[in-house]
Amino acid sequence: MEVKVLGPGCAKCTEAEKIMTAAIAEAGVTATIEKISDFQQIAKFGVFSTPAVVIDGAVKCVGKVPGKAEALAWLRN
């Protein structure tokens, strides 16, 4: 599983990355997590509001920090 957190490095983006990292550990899934801060790469996902979370190429969340329960649901499905 490949998880990407998109954002310029703001506080909310950092929080989203921490939540996704904790959710991966709690779910017990094998996943890599990548932080993408380059706006051209972010735009390729059709994302224009950050933070955003992408899992295996699918945009799951845009413009908000996901809740841990929400993140766990994405990882388990």
Predicted feature residues:
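Structural micro-motif
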Residues: 46-53
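Local sequence-structure signature of Cys/Sec-based thiol-disulfide redox active-site neighborhoods
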Residues: 1-22
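Non-catalytic, surface beta->alpha helical segment in thiol-disulfide oxidoreductase systems
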Residues: 55-77
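Short, surface-exposed acidic/glycine-rich loop or hinge patches that mediate macromolecular interfaces
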Residues: 10-11, 36, 65
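Conserved helix-turn-beta segment immediately C-terminal to the redox Cys motif
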Residues: 19-32
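Terminal leader/tail segments of proteins
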Residues: 2-3, 30-37, 73-74
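Acidic, metal-coordinating helix/loop segments flanking the phosphotransfer/catalytic sites
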Residues: 41
